[in-house]
Amino acid sequence: MKHVVLNNGVKMPLLGFGVFQVTDLAECERAVEDALRVGYRLIDTAASYRNEAAVGAAVGNALRNSGLARGDLFITTKLWVADAGYEKTKEAFDRSMKQLGLDVLDLYLIHQPYGDVHGAWRAMQELHRERRIRAIGVSNFHPDRVMDLIVFNEVAPAVNQLEAHPFHQRLATHAFLQEQGVQLEAWAPFAEGKHDIFHNPVLAAIGASHGKTVAQVILRWLLQRGIVVIPKSVRKERMEENFAVFDFELDEAAMGEIAALDTRTSSFFDHRDPAIVKWLGTRR
C-alpha cells in the first residue's frame, strides 16, 4: 500500500475503505472484515453514520484473529455538527472511541463547517497533544474556512475530506490545500453513480485501453493526483476490483481527457447554501 505523509509526519494510506450509508450493522461489520482481508488498511467512518460499533467490532476481530497489528491500521471518524464545541467535542470523542473500541484514533475530522468549529478544534488540539489522536482535520470545508482555522489556531488541519470525482475535480481547492500542507481526501469518488458515470465514454475508453473498469480508472486518476480516496462497497469482489489500481498508470493524454470532464459543480449540494446549512445543522 502506498502512503502519503501528513503535515505532522503521520503516514496515511492513499487508498481506503468508506462505510457511508452502510446502516445494517451486521453487513457493515462483514464489509469491513472483507475489506481488511482484501488489503485495505484505512477505514473511514463517522458518528453520523451510526456504524462506528460495527467498524470497531470488525477491527477488533481482525486484530485478534488475522495477525494484523494496531499500527497496521488507520482509522478515521468524524465529529457531527450537533457535537461541535469544546466540551461537547470531548464528550463526542469519548463516545466514538468507546464505540470503536480504540485507545488512540488515527484521524479525527470535523464533519461539517458549521456550529462552534473553533471550540471543537481547541478540544481536538488538546486530544492531539495528549496523543489520543494522531492527526486532526476537517471535512467539507471551503478554502476560506480552512484558512480561518489555520490563522486562529496552533495546529493546522492535516486533512480536508471533500467531494471529488471526474465531474467535480477540485483543481483550485487542491492547489490551495497543497500550498497550505493540507492533504485532500476524496469522498464519493464515483459521484454515487450520478451522470451515468460508469458508462461515460471517455472513462470507458481509457479503461478499455488498460484492461480496467471505469471505477479503476477513476481511482487511479485520483491516486496519481496524490489524493487519498475512500471508495465504498459491501461486495467483496468490488472491493477487490477497487483495490487493483496499483498495477497501471494513466499517461498525460488520459489525465487530460479526464480533466476535460470537470463541471466545477457539486453533484450533491452546495455547503454554502443556507437551506443546506439549516438542514445539516439541525440533523441529529
Summary of predicted features, one role per range:
Residues 53-64, 93-97, 124, 146, ...:
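Short, well-ordered amphipathic alpha-helices
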